[in-house]
A protein has these predicted regions:
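Soluble catalytic regions of membrane-associated enzymes that act on cell-envelope
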Residues: 1-166
Length: 166
């Protein structure tokens, strides 16, 4: 057991403050009425803040998530230690595009990794910088071609990502 168990608890109001002070708060400053998502890199945010704050993130922790999401993450070789806990899309431009990611959040202090396509800094707060991809896909889109599942499964991970863009 831990030696200083009590120090792991937050002071009154501290947990709520931590929950409400993540990158979601910076995303809300954008006042963007479109339906899109944001991805992040090493922001230190807590899980499920997007659900609480009313934003759309690529990060969540939900034990009854659709199994196809885990399957997709496995097929894309995303490093997800648990099937129901997703942190981000690994900063992969292709996956961000497919997931309708319009914004990318990093910590303000020091430059973090910003994927290709996020050229414009949309907003800066005390803690975060949010970049925008002006070519983000909408949340819903359709394909006019397809490949059989058997053929798809034989592709490498990079070929699978490329196939999803066709």
């Amino acid at each position: 057991y831990e030696k200083d168990y009590l120090s792991e608890f937050e002071e009154k109001g501290g947990a709520l403050e931590a929950l409400q002070s993540g990158p979601d708060k910076a995303i809300q400053k954008l006042e963007d009425s479109s339906v899109s998502r944001y991805d992040q890199y090493k922001t230190g945010s807590y899980v499920n803040t997007a659900m609480y704050m009313g934003t759309n993130s690529t990060s969540y922790y939900f034990s009854v998530a659709n199994g196809n999401i885990s399957r997709f993450f496995d097929e894309m070789y995303l490093n997800t230690p648990w099937d129901y806990h997703y942190n981000n899309l690994d900063g992969r431009t292709i996956l961000d595009r497919l997931a309708a990611v319009k914004y990318f959040a990093i910590k303000k202090n020091g430059y973090g990794y910003v994927p290709y396509g996020y050229d414009q800094e949309a907003v800066t707060t005390k803690k975060y910088r949010i970049y925008e991809d002006e070519d983000a896909l909408p949340l819903g889109y359709t394909y006019d071609t397809w490949i059989p599942r058997e053929k798809y499964e034989k592709l490498s991970v990079t070929e699978k990502q490329q196939a999803l863009l066709q």
